[in-house]
């Protein structure tokens, strides 16, 4: 997974999953989904039905719920039924109606923020200047700890040192403390 500069990495998809006459495609807005593309669920959907099948096609498990950050591969695009079949990494198969495709995005590359809670065999981290509030030690730690076996940083060594030295954290103004106080007053 490429964790930063995801727009640039997605453009390079043509090398990872090039178009061909035998691969169905579905255009949604500015995005073209193609059989074989890696995709990510971008919001929780507790109603979405999934099933697991044996290698012989027999369903042996069913359930509901696909969650933000789940990744998979497009197995089929069917224009007759207006559905796209995605096989998630844990072998859950999900049929998305074409009206639900806004819940997916291409996942050849993802941002560090979207990678939180997930692991990948290898992580490529482009190291280039960015906003100071993002160039901090916590974000660098998050990026590095997403990798199971291999981390490769590409770019400017100064950016690595800047992030490692920057201990600042962006203060969040969520009003959570006020909401908790309101609940205590009930």
List the model feature ranges, each with a label.
Residues 27-33, 63-64:
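Short, surface-exposed secondary-structure edge patches
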Residues 1-10:
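Single conserved hydrophobic/aromatic residue that forms the stacking wall/gate
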Residues 15-25, 52-56, 101-106:
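Short, structured beta-strand/loop micro-motifs enriched in basic residues and often containing a Trp
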Residues 20-29, 153-158:
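A generic structural motif
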Residues 28, 42-44, 113, 128-129:
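A structural micro-motif recognizing beta-strand termini
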Residues 13, 17, 37-40, 44-45, ...:
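Amphipathic, well-packed alpha-helical segments that form the structural scaffold of globular domains
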Residues 31-58:
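Short coil-to-beta transition motif at edge beta-strands of beta-rich domains
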Residues 56, 60-64, 68-186:
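C-terminal accessory regions
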């Amino acid at each position: 997974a490429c964790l930063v500069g995801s727009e640039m990495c997605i453009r390079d998809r043509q090398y990872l999953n090039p178009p061909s006459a035998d691969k169905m495609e579905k255009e949604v807005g500015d995005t073209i989904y193609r059989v074989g593309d890696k995709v990510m669920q971008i919001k929780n959907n507790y109603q979405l039905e999934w099933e697991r099948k044996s290698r012989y096609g027999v369903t042996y498990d069913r359930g509901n719920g696909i969650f933000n950050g789940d990744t998979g591969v497009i197995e089929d695009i069917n224009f007759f039924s207006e559905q796209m079949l995605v096989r998630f990494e844990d072998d859950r198969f999900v049929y998305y109606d074409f009206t639900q495709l806004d819940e997916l995005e291409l996942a050849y590359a993802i941002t560090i923020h979207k990678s939180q809670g997930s692991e990948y065999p290898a992580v490529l981290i482009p190291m280039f200047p960015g906003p100071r509030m993002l160039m901090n030690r916590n974000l660098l730690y998050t990026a590095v700890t997403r990798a199971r076996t291999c981390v490769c940083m590409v770019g400017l060594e100064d950016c690595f040192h800047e992030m490692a030295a920057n201990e600042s954290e962006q203060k969040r103004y969520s009003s959570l403390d006020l909401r908790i106080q309101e609940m205590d007053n009930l």
